[in-house]
Amino acid sequence: MTYDKMATDRSRGLNDDEIIVRRKQYGDNVLTPPQRVSLWKLYIDKYRDPIIEILIVAAVISLVLAFIQNDFIETAGIFIAIFLATTVGFYFERDAEKKFRVLTTLNEDQLVKVRRNGKVTEIPRRDIVVGDVILVEVGDEVPADAELFSAINLQIDESTLTGEPLATKEVLDNDATAAAQQQDFSCDHTQKPASSHESTYPQNLILRSTMVMNGHGEAVVIRVGDNTEIGKVTILSNENTHVQTPLNLQLNRLARLISQAGAIVAFVAFVAFLVHDILTNSIWHSHDYLGMAQIVLNYFMMAVTLIVMAVPEGLPMAVNLALALNMRRMLKSNNLVRKLHASETMGATTVICTDKTGTLTENRMSVSSMLQADVPARQNHLDFNAKSWDRLFYMALAVNTTAELDNGKPIGNPTEGALLMWLEQQGQNYEQLRKECKIIEQKPFSTNTKYMATTVSVDDKTYTFVKGAPEIVLQMTNLSGNDCLKVKETLFSYQKQAMRTLAFACCEGCFCSNNLIYQAVTGIADPVRNDVPAAVNQCHQAGIEVKMVTGDTSATAIEIARQIGIWPKEDNAEETEKHVKEWHITGPDFSNLTDDEAYKRAKLLRVMSRARPADKQRLVELLQKSGEVVAVTGDGTNDAPALNYAHVGLSLGSGTSVAKQASDITLLDDSFHSIASAVMWGRSLYKNIQRFLFFQLVVNLSALLLVLGGAVIGTEMPLTVTQILWVNIIMDTFAALALASLPPSREVMNEQPRKPSAFIITNSMWRGIIFCGTSFFILMLLFLVWCERHGQGSIIDVHELTLFFTTFVMLQFWNLFNAKSMGSVHSAFRHFWRDHGLVLVLVLILLGQWLIVTFGGRMFRTLPMSLTEWLAIIFATGTVVLGSGELWKGINRIRRKTKAL
C-alpha cells in the first residue's frame, strides 16, 4: 500500500485524530524482532543428529535386552553417552547466544523530531506513523522511510543499507516522484530501478537506519516498521533457509552407512550361526521347542549386540566437543561463533561473497594523496613565503567546511571530515585556526554550483577560500601551462584509483569566479584495510574464490577489487573491457537476467556493484545450486538476507543488529583476516573429526570381530560389558578431548577445499581402519589361543583375561598416536609436548586403566598386574602399533622426497 504524501498538511503535520487513524491503518514503527528459539527447543534439536538417532534406537533395543538379562550397565552407558553429547552442544550454543544478545540490542525509544498539530516536537521512534512530517539534520538516524519535500545540501550515509557511504538527496519533480513510487526496491529481482543505472534508491527517498551526514531536510513518512526497506530486509534475513551444512550431510551419510552395515552384518551372522546350529545340533531333530527358542533368542541377542557395537557411541560427543572447543578458541581470536557447525563449515567453504564498505575497507574516508601548489610568485600586493602559504591553506581547510571532529571521529560530511583529520595529522589544531578567523560570508556547496566558498577576515585582511569539483574550481584559477598539465595528470591518476577528488583555491577579498590562486588538489578514499590483501591471497592459496558484492559504484568497486587482489592490477584497455564484461555486473543488470543466464554468470563474477539485498541473496542461492559452499561477509543491513541464506554468514562486530542476527559468526575485530583464520580452524577441525572417526571405528571393528570370533569358536565374550563400556565411552571421550584439542595446522591452507560430496571417511582411512581393526582382532585372537595353551588348564582364568583386557586397551592407546598423525607424513611425536591436551589425556587413560585393573575387582572382572606385566604389555603393543605406523610414515616421506627429486 503506497501512501499519498499530499494527504498530509506539510506546514502543520498530522493532528491527534489523524495519528490514531494512521496507526490503525498502517501499524506502529517497530521492527518485528526475530523469534527466539526456546531453550527446550534448542535442547531437543540436539537429538535430531543422525548418529544420536541411531544411538537412541540402539539404547531402546539394549533396554529391552536389559530387562530380559537383568543387566542394565550397557544400557545406562549408551544413555549417558547420548545425554553427554547433546548437553555439551546445547550448553555451548546457549553460552554463545548469551554473548551475542549483548551485541544486538535494538533501541526503539530513540527520540526524533516531528511536526504535529502545527508544532515541532520530539517523540520516540516507535510512535511515528505513516503521514508524519519528520525533520532530519546532521547526526540524525532516519527513523522511517520517507519522501523529501524539502532538502538543503542533504547527504545521507547509506552504507548500512546499500554499501554507499554518501548519497546526495534532493526533492524530485512530480514525474520522477511518481516513477519512484511505482518501484519496489528490495525483494523483487525482476524489477528495474526507475532511477539511473548507477543509483540504488531514488534521490528523494530517505530510508530508515541511514545516517544524515550533511545538511537538513523535511520529509513525509511513507512506510513504517516491517514495511520499510530495512523491515523487508529483516524479514528476509529471518527466514528459515533449511540449508544443510556439509558436516551434517556427511554425518547423515555415515549414519545411514553404519545402520545399514550393522544390520547386514547382524542379519548375516544371525542366519549363518542359526543355519550352522541347525545342521550340527541334534536338538533341532527333537521336540524340545523351548530349547530351540532359547538358541534362536541367544543368536538374536548376539545379532543385536553386533548392531549396538557397530554404533560409534563416542562420535556425537567427539563432534560436539570438537565444535565446542573450536567455539571457545575462536572466541579468543575474536570470532564469536553462534552455531556449533558454523566453525567446521568454514573449512568446507569454496566461495566467499564479501561486502566492500566496512569489511574490505575501513568505512572511514581519509586523504590518500594531496598535491599542494608551490609558493606562488608575488601577485599585486600578495607576497607569501612557505610558512605563510601553508598556513593559508590550513585555514582554508579549517573554515571552509561544515564538518567537526569528536575525539578524532568525523561528524558531518565524511569527505570534509577526512580533510580535518589530515589537518590534525599535519600537527594543526583546526579549532584554533577557526578562532583566528572571523567568517564574513559562506556560500554552501550545492549540486548545481559544485563548490563551497567561505570569506573570512584574518590579520586585518580578507580572504575567500573555494573548495569543490576540480573541473569547476580549476576553471576559476590562474593555472596554466605545465602546472595545469601536472595537476590534470594527478587528477586522472586519482580518478583511476576511484578516489573522490577536490580542488582548492583562494583569493584576497570577496569571492570572484575567476583568477583565483590555485592551492591544491586531493584524492580522498575509503582505504582498504591493511590486512585484507594478504588475507585474500591466503584464501586464493587455499582454493577459495573471493567475490565482492557492494552497493557502491562500478569504478570504485573494480578499483578496490584491484587493490585487494581479486582483479588484475595491470591490464590494457582491451583486456580491461573484456574482464569487465566477464567478471563484473551491476545489481540492476543481474536482476534482469533470466535464471539460466544468472546461473552461468554467477560462477564467472568477481565484482557486483550497485547490488541490492535481493541481488546478493540471489547470487548466494545460485552459487549454492551450482554446488559451491558459500560464506558471506558483511556489516550492513543490506547484507542480512545473503548472510542468512549462506552456508556460513559472517557479520562484523561493528555491523548492524540485523546483520549480526542473520549471521552464524561475528568477527569482533572487524578483520577480514579473521575469515582466513576461520577457514584454517574449520579445516583443522574437520581433520580432527576424521582422526577421531579413524580411532573410534578401529575400536568398534576390532570389538565387533571379537564378538563374532567368540561366537565362532563357541566361547564367551572375553571382554565384559563394563570393560567395553570403559573402552567405548569413557576412553573414547578422552580420545575425543585429545584429538579435538589438537591445534590448527597452517598446512591445511595449502590444500584445495574438499568436495561437498566427498565422504568424511576417505579411501585411505577405510584401508587403515580395516587393516588396524583386523590386525588388532588377529593379535587378540592369538593372545587368547596362547592363554589357552600356556595357561593353567584349558579355561582362561581372570588374571589372563585381565592381561587380555589391558592389551586391548593399550592397542587403542597407541593407536591414538597413529590417529593424531593420520593423513600426514610427519611423525606422531612431532610437536608432541606442545599438544598439552593430548599429553594430559594419555596420562588419564593410563591412570584410569591402572585404577580399573588394580581396584576394579568383580565389577570389572580384573586382578592386579605386576610391574613386569605392565611394562611388557606397554612395550609390546607400542612396538607393534606405533612402530608399524612410524615405519609406514617414514616410507611415505622417502617416496615424497624421491618424487620431488
Named regions from a protein language model:
Residues 731, 776-777, 801-817:
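Generic alpha-helical transmembrane segments
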Residues 1-753, 760-761, 774, 789, ...:
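Conserved cytosolic headpiece of P-type ATPases
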Residues 782-792:
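Juxtamembrane and boundary regions of transmembrane helices in multi-pass small-molecule transporters
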Residues 755-769:
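Hydrophobic alpha-helical transmembrane segments and their immediately adjacent juxtamembrane loops
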Residues 793-801:
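Membrane-interfacial loop- and helix-cap regions that link adjacent transmembrane helices
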Residues 767-783, 810:
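Alpha-helical transmembrane segments of multi-pass integral membrane proteins
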